[in-house]
Amino acid sequence: MRRWKLILLTPAVLLGVTYFYYTEIKPVVIFGLRSDYARAIPFQKIPEGLTSLKAESCGQCHREIYEEWKTSIHARAYDDPFFQAYWKKDKNIWVCLNCHTPLENQQPTLIREIPRGRVEKAVQEPNPHYDPEYQREAVTCAVCHVRDGVIYGPFEDSAAPHPTKFDPNFRTAQPCYRCHNVVSGPAQFYNVGPCGTYAEYEGKFFIQERGFICQSCHMPEIDRPVAANSPLRRGRQHLWRGGHDPDMVKRAVAVQVKADSESPKPGDRVEFTLTLVNAGAGHKVPTGDPDRFFTVEFSVEDRQGHVVEQQTSTMGRWILWQPAIVELYDNRLLPLASREYRFAYRLPAAVEGLKLKARVQYHILTDKQHAMLRTRYGLTGDDPYRYVVYEREFPLSKEIAAAMRRENDRLTAVSRHPEERSCKVNADG
């Protein structure tokens, strides 16, 4: 009888545990709620002397900064097709807006209560100050600069026609912390938070020994008037180039390819080594969204371009998403770290026309994920989701060593002194 009771009881217990897990433990989103982004930045009133909080209004005087902002991923953080598709996949959960449209003025609802920290149980009510047009500005000027009717910035002296105040935090990485240090939540076992760029950067080489901050690379210094008819002074460009910009990623990494044989002959087994260096980023590469990764590809092609042999390695994060979030491993590159990838090939009797192609690609997401977002979640547009960071071809003949020497001569300084390839020093690539 006891045995039958156990048999009958076991499914009930399993059902109860499963129900408890999915209703009380399993996260609805892939991150935890930190207090400073559990809610939107409180409603901001228009500072005296201005007619609007909108970026275009700021651009009447700060024209160059406004034009830069318009080209940035910050300006597109809300209507970006990838965000919109992922957000639809996540059932348009409100909490994503706290970084993609951070101001209360930009959000359709107000969050009054978050019972037990469960975002799907949040008590919401209509926001009387919601401006849908302003929402589309995403990470706009006021997100960083306006609080309580005052415009904050990095300068102590100002002759602006509106209230201003100096904030020393603008000379640190602190303004980036709120949205670029997304942390883990319950039943989430990451090595670093899901979008933990700030945590990767904090305390590392570039800040400790070089004094770099996020803005050193992502908001390069420039000498110009901050506003129309104002004096020349050193400020920063408002570009925020990152993983969506091929030139920025190319600037962060250095690549070398070498062969272990100076003069290979038919029948020889030649080993090629591609060294990938995080030579210019103060955080891991790749960083940001956990879907991002690099591929390192070797292929041997014949005269007609047919692939004879190939090998692909991947660098990124591998995460188990169900039933709990568990990061299985993370093989991304720390600042100034390098990794070698090897490929061996035995030269055939006829090598004429054969060539080795070495390529490094950066991927925002996989082909499978991209297809899913298109077919199921309305991803639109033709924005690239992968691009080539490095690609070279080498003839598989006795000339290979000379070809590789020419290639690697370009990168000698980088390999000897990788810390000098920072974006601050290497601003033009």
Enumerate the language-model features and the residues they cover:
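Eukaryote-biased RCC1-like beta-propeller repeat architecture
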Residues: 3, 119-120, 298
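Short, conserved sequence motifs used for protein processing/export or organelle targeting and
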Residues: 210-216, 220-415, 423
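Acidic/polar hotspots within intrinsically disordered regions
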Residues: 426-428
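N-terminal Sec-pathway targeting helices
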Residues: 1-13
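Sequence context of c-type cytochrome heme-c attachment sites
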Residues: 11-171, 175-178, 184-208
